[in-house]
């Protein structure tokens, strides 16, 4: 497995196809083994003159039963290890896509994204996951195994999104773009992976994304109308604006019901620190979150 720098999809399709074919071959072998066992071993008493009770063919000490079970377990182990390796490689591919395609302007643009479309990076990540998961779902006959596989994909994808978010600076317009991307990830998890029970991960992250969009547009417009000579009034307006934003953010950070236990207060605080105006609002957020403005009388 190697990453193709020109086409991110091609480098993963070939090994994935080979593994899918191996899964199908292993299923066929197990089915043939089961048919042979049922027709030849279980009915052996009908083919020989010695009376052999059917009970002995199901005896857990029977060497045939032991060998058959061991073979089935070994095949299951190989499939599980292969799936784990496949997930690891897909996640490596997604990390590469983030490095190659995630622009700093995606979440910190100069202008707002009016078309509400996902970023190119988000589109490519979802595309490669669709290819991978569709091929695996066609290869795995066991629904329980497929559900565990999709759950692992969902959880690892969530961790990669978090890791990527912590590398970016986000402004108000970029916060809206981030929410658009997160909604597309959520749609993929719900519709393609059928992991509705894990949608809470992405809904919680969307609520975190809303913290990046908190802004006071009215205050900003008033500040621009102030005469350039009145610098003190301008600074006061800016101070009050940052104070109001900081208090609003602190209030939402402390509201644990928004994050459904997915994020702790400190984790939300850490994510919010990626705001572009963080150092302007940090003192007010600290006062609201940690009670640094409280005093003992």
Please name every model-derived segment.
Residues 1-297:
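Extended alpha-helical "rod" scaffolds
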């Amino acid at each position: 497995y190697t990453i193709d720098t020109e086409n991110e999809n091609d480098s993963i399709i070939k090994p994935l196809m080979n593994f899918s074919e191996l899964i199908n071959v292993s299923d066929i072998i197990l089915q043939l083994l089961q048919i042979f066992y049922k027709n030849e071993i279980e009915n052996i008493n009908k083919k020989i003159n010695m009376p052999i009770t059917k009970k002995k063919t199901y005896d857990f000490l029977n060497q045939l039963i032991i060998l058959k079970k061991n073979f089935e377990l070994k095949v299951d182990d190989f499939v599980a290890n292969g799936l784990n390796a496949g997930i690891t490689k897909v996640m490596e591919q997604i990390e590469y896509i983030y490095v190659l395609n995630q622009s700093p302007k995606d979440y910190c643009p100069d202008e707002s994204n009016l078309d509400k479309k996902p970023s190119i990076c988000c589109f490519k990540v979802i595309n490669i996951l669709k290819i991978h998961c569709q091929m695996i779902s066609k290869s795995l006959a066991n629904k329980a195994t497929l559900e565990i596989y999709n759950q692992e994909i969902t959880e690892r994808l969530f961790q990669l999104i978090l890791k990527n978010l912590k590398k970016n600076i986000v402004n108000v317009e970029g916060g809206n773009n981030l929410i658009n991307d997160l909604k597309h990830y959520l749609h993929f998890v719900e519709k393609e992976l059928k992991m509705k029970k894990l949608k809470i991960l992405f809904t919680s992250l969307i609520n975190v994304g809303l913290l990046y969009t908190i802004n006071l547009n009215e205050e900003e417009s008033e500040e621009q109308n102030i005469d350039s000579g009145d610098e003190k009034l301008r600074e006061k307006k800016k101070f009050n604006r940052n104070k109001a934003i900081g208090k609003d953010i602190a209030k939402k950070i402390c509201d644990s019901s928004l994050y459904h236990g997915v994020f702790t207060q400190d984790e939300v605080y850490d994510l919010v620190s990626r705001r572009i105006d963080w150092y302007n609002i940090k003192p007010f957020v600290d006062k609201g979150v940690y009670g640094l403005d409280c005093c003992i009388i």
